[in-house]
């Protein structure tokens, strides 16, 4: 595929350009914050972390919910399929989740640009990527490994 970077440092890059403007039907989502957390935050640090996660992922979550709802809407029998509807039914979403990585649990690490820390994150990312490939490599180009409807609605 073709690498994509929006140049933003304050939030996730938009998914829609990958969906609409790229030739690849496979879209890999790499999460740096968990989609959901168990329990309610109580300490100042827990609340601060959750606020940062929600702010960081709000646009991404809204965009992915849009994909889920648009796909469900396009499934209605009276809808005549155009380019968007065809694309909704041929895109294959995949996701690598970072939950459980202690280095990303705290909100203060999101802005840490210390070389050794970034190298550690790179190695952890490679490990997660290799683990994902070991489980799902055969799905690439064939079918989605992420159920967008179940995950985002």
Predicted regions and their residues:
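Non-catalytic peripheral regions of patatin-like phospholipases
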Residues: 2-4, 8-153
């Amino acid at each position: 595929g073709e690498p994509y970077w929006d140049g933003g440092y304050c939030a996730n890059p938009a998914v829609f350009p990958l969906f609409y403007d790229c030739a690849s039907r496979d879209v890999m989502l790499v999460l740096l914050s968990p989609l959901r957390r168990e329990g309610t935050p109580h300490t100042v640090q827990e609340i601060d972390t959750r606020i940062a996660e929600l702010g960081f992922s709000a646009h991404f979550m809204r965009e992915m919910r849009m994909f889920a709802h648009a796909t469900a809407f396009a499934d209605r029998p009276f809808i005549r399929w155009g380019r968007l509807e065809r694309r909704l039914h041929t895109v294959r979403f995949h996701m690598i989740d970072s939950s459980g990585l202690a280095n990303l649990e705290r909100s203060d690490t999101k802005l840490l640009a210390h070389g050794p820390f970034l190298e550690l994150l790179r190695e952890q990312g490679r490990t997660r990527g290799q683990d994902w490939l070991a489980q799902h490599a055969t799905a690439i180009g064939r079918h989605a490994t992420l159920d967008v409807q179940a995950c985002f609605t």
